[in-house]
């Protein structure tokens, strides 16, 4: 009887997953038509909807099980059997790792944290069984010796193009070949020694389409991305070629929106991509291709493995303490853990619910490469012995309502009810202080250029950052400036950008408080110079490229552009890589 019940429950869960994956695939496939028809707003709407689908299907499946099987408590033997049966259902499945994560999500909705171990859920994945099977064909190989280099590349591009033709494929392929020769030294071999491996599907995101592959030669492997854009006049053109793991990693960065990529075998795809970008984790790559829940699962497995192989202690993160969040980190692991405080500083007129809403907004919005993606977790257990006394005291002081303890001695755990995890960066204020101390003017100039660019790209994507103090931005290992303090973000239409009234009397000039009326939502751009850029050397470097950010007129124009549906192009690669900016025969449009 229990075997039959276990099979029925397992089938209910797998059917829920299949519903989810079918809907996910349908909306992913729509990106191709959206790209062809230049429906950029629809692409953003689809991205937001797709992110929500997973939780909706989990809740549906959870409700089905609760109602159909009257589940109120865990039957140990039954649920071990359910997991065993479910594992059998995944033996020949195309997405076993995703289906395991879906199972975990449903189970965790049904039962308490004390049951979250490998007897009942997939703490350890069984998807590694795929490594022993014949790998699915997710890429096509091309050998230029047969048709010549130019014709081979033309064939590659045409095999991926949509119903829209290239505006001048001959010109673009010449630019590709020139760029390969200049930048990819390992491709400078005889044609008979070259081979291209090209993934069989196009990666879509925002206004771009990306072809991804590698060139193999006796000199080694060269990964690459070809960026294709729509000229919005009925033609496609190649905009850039990236030929290094580092530049590709930025395209797949944690501050970018998720790709739309129609692939039935994500396990094989992630393995291929990791071969091209070894510094990217599987968690990074699953998230980048749209499976953010799988990214969370993979991250947590990696984190548990790291805890087992390390012995350093968690500690408070470097930088100025936040008024809303408390942040801690593990020095040997490149992430930070953020919890919402029970009480905020008086100047913060928001609630916990508001803060969670802001983080959700960022998850659903186009992050334009300037807002860090976060992973949200509930009921997370840490070994208490790994927390230093200062951190334990701080957590107990600022967030006692979400902290509890289980077990004793070496087995003691600290359970955090709710937290966010994101990539660790160097706070911009500390980065600049270090550069100033070491008289590294170029680093100061680059960082403040990036700071201004981050603000401009955020507001052009309809995100007002709110608190723009330097401490709320971080610098990545690639040198990019990223915003990561979300509790005051707003849409542009919610803000009133004003010119600060000029003081006309001595009393007004030296007033401790504003002598003019200030309403909620008012923002005075010129105050950036006073509050965020008080150091004269910072302000000087900032003004070289971004003096316009100190004027209300600039912000008002951006606000009007957003209201009119005008969004500036933000490319996930430097302008210097764009073919229109390269020295060889400048491509004009």
Curated annotation (Swiss-Prot):
Gene of this entry: aceK
GO process annotations (BP): glucose metabolic process; glyoxylate cycle; tricarboxylic acid cycle
Keywords for this protein: ATP-binding, Cytoplasm, Glyoxylate bypass, Hydrolase, Kinase, Nucleotide-binding, Protein phosphatase, Serine/threonine-protein kinase, Transferase, Tricarboxylic acid cycle
Main location group: cytoplasm
InterPro entries: AceK_kinase, AceK_regulatory, Isocitrate_DH_AceK
Gene Ontology molecular functions: [isocitrate dehydrogenase (NADP+)] kinase activity; AMP binding; ATP binding; phosphoprotein phosphatase activity; protein serine/threonine kinase activity
Described purpose of this protein according to its UniProt entry: Bifunctional enzyme which can phosphorylate or dephosphorylate isocitrate dehydrogenase (IDH) on a specific serine residue. This is a regulatory mechanism which enables bacteria to bypass the Krebs cycle via the glyoxylate shunt in response to the source of carbon. When bacteria are grown on glucose, IDH is fully active and unphosphorylated, but when grown on acetate or ethanol, the activity of IDH declines drastically concomitant with its phosphorylation.
GO CC aspect terms: cytoplasm
Coiled coil spans: none
HAMAP family reported in the protein's UniProt record: AceK (MF_00747)
Pfam families per the UniProt record, alphabetical: AceK_kinase (PF06315), AceK_regulatory (PF20423)
Species of origin: Colwellia psychrerythraea (strain 34H / ATCC BAA-681)
EC number(s) stated in the UniProt entry for this protein: 2.7.11.5, 3.1.3.-
UniProt family annotation: Belongs to the AceK family.
Protein name: Isocitrate dehydrogenase kinase/phosphatase
Disulfide bonds: none
Binding site for ATP: 317-323, 338
Subcellular location field: Cytoplasm
UniProt cross-references to PANTHER family, sorted A to Z: ISOCITRATE DEHYDROGENASE KINASE_PHOSPHATASE, PTHR39559
Catalysed reactions listed for this entry: L-seryl-[isocitrate dehydrogenase] + ATP = O-phospho-L-seryl-[isocitrate dehydrogenase] + ADP + H(+)
Active-site feature positions: 373
């Amino acid at each position: 009887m229990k075997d039959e019940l276990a099979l029925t429950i397992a089938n209910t869960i797998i059917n829920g997953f299949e519903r989810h994956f079918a809907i996910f695939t349908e909306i992913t496939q729509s990106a191709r038509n959206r790209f062809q028809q230049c429906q950029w707003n629809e692409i953003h709407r689809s991205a937001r909807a797709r992110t929500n689908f997973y939780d909706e299907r989990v809740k549906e499946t959870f409700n089905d099980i609760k109602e159909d099987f009257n589940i109120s408590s865990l039957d140990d033997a039954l649920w071990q059997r359910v997991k065993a049966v479910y594992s059998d259902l995944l033996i020949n499945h195309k997405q076993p790792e995703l289906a395991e994560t879906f199972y975990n999500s449903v189970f965790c909705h049904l039962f308490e944290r004390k049951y979250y171990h490998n007897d009942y859920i997939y703490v350890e994945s069984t998807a590694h069984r795929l490594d022993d099977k014949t790998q699915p064909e997710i890429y096509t190989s091309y050998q230029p010796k047969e048709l010549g280099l130019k014709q081979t590349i033309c064939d590659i591009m045409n095999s991926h193009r949509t119903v829209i033709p290239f505006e001048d494929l001959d010109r673009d392929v010449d630019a590709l070949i020139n760029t390969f020769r200049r930048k990819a030294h390992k491709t400078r071999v005889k044609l008979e020694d070259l081979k291209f491996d090209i993934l069989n599907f196009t990666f879509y995101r925002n206004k771009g389409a990306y072809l991804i592959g590698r060139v193999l030669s006796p000199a080694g492997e060269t990964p690459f991305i070809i960026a294709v854009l729509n000229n919005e006049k009925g033609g496609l053109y190649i905009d850039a070629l990236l030929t290094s793991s580092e530049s590709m990693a930025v395209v797949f960065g944690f501050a970018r929106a998720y790709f739309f990529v129609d692939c039935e075998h994500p396990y094989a795809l992630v393995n291929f991509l990791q071969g091209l970008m070894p510094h990217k984790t599987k968690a990074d790559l699953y998230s980048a291709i749209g499976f953010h829940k799988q990214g969370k699962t993979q991250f947590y497995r990696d984190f548990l493995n790291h805890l087992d192989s390390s012995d350093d202690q968690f500690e408070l993160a470097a930088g100025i303490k936040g008024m809303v969040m408390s942040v801690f980190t593990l020095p040997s692991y490149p992430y930070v853990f953020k919890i919402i405080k029970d009480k905020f500083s008086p100047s913060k007129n928001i609630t916990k619910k508001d803060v969670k809403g802001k983080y959700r907004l960022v998850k659903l919005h186009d992050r334009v490469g300037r807002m860090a993606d976060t992973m949200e977790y509930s009921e997370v257990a840490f070994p208490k012995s790994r927390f230093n006394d200062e951190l334990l005291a701080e957590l107990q002081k600022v967030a006692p309502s979400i902290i509890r303890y289980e077990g004793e001695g070496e087995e003691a755990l600290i359970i955090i009810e709710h937290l966010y995890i994101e990539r660790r960066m160097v706070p911009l204020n500390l980065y600049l202080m270090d550069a100033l101390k070491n008289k590294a003017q170029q680093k100061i100039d680059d960082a403040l250029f990036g700071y201004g660019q981050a603000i401009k790209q955020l507001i052009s994507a309809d995100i007002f950052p709110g608190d723009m103090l330097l401490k709320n931005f971080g610098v990545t290992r690639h040198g990019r400036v990223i915003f990561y303090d979300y509790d005051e973000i707003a849409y542009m239409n919610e803000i009133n950008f004003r010119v600060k009234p000029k003081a006309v009397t001595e009393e007004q000039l030296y007033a401790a408080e504003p002598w003019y009326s200030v309403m909620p939502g008012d923002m005075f751009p010129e105050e950036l110079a006073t509050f965020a850029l008080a150091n004269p050397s910072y302000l000087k470097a900032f003004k070289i490229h971004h003096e316009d950010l100190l004027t209300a007129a600039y912000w008002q124009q951006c606000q009007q552009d957003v209201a009119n549906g005008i969004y500036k192009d933000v490319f996930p690669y430097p302008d210097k890589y764009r073919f229109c900016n390269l020295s060889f025969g400048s491509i004009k449009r």
